[in-house]
Amino acid sequence: GVVGCLAAFLASRIPGIQVELIDIDPAKAAIAEALGLPFALTRDAIRDADIVIHASGNPMGLQSALTLAAYEGTILEMSWYGSTLVPLPLGEEFHSKRLILKSSQVGGVSPARRARRSYADRMALALSLLADDRLDALITGESPFEELPELMVTLSTTPSGTPIGTLCHRIRY
C-alpha cells in the first residue's frame, strides 16, 4: 500500500541502506520500478534484514516479517489491525533470533520526538519529501470533490480496475 511504498521510498534515500519492496502481488513490481526500488515476492525476499518495516495490514505479512529479520533485528509494525486478533509464532524465529517487535503510530509523533519540530515544520518537511514526480506512481485514480459520497461507496466495495487495486485516489477540490 501507500504507507509501505512511502516508507521504502524514503528509506532508500538514506546512504548505505539496502531497501527491498516486498509484496505477495507481482503487479506491485511496476510500482517498485517507478519508485526506483528493487522488488521481491515474499518467498524470494532477502533474509537477514536489520530492520523490516511491515505495513500490509495482513497478519500473514507480519508473520513473514519475522522470518526476514536478522538476529536481534527489529520489525517495525506500521499496520492497523483494529480489534482483529493477530496470531504470531513467538516461539520460533522470534524467540531464537531475539527479535524486537516495535509498533509505529503513523498518525502521531512520539512524545520523545515531538518537541524537536513544530507541527508546521513537520508538515513542511513531509510536503517537501512528497514533491517527487516518482511518487505519482502511487496515484491510482482521481475524482472531483463533488463525487466523493458516491466514490467512497465505490472505492470501499470494488477494486479500481487497475491490477493493483486502489493505492491512493486523489480528490480534486
What are these regions (language model features)?
Residues 23, 54, 105:
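Conserved acidic E/D residue at the C-terminus of a beta-strand in Rossmann-like folds
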Residues 25-28, 59, 82:
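Helix N-cap at the beta1-alpha1 junction of Rossmann-like dinucleotide-binding domains, i.e.
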Residues 44-52:
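A short acidic, Gly/Pro-enriched loop at the edge of an enzyme's catalytic core
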Residues 52-53, 76:
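N-terminal Rossmann-like NAD(P) cofactor-binding module of classical short-chain dehydrogenase/reductase
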Residues 63-128, 170-173:
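Glycine-rich phosphate-binding loop and adjacent beta-alpha segment
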Residues 117-173:
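C-terminal hydrophobic helical "lid"/dimerization subdomain
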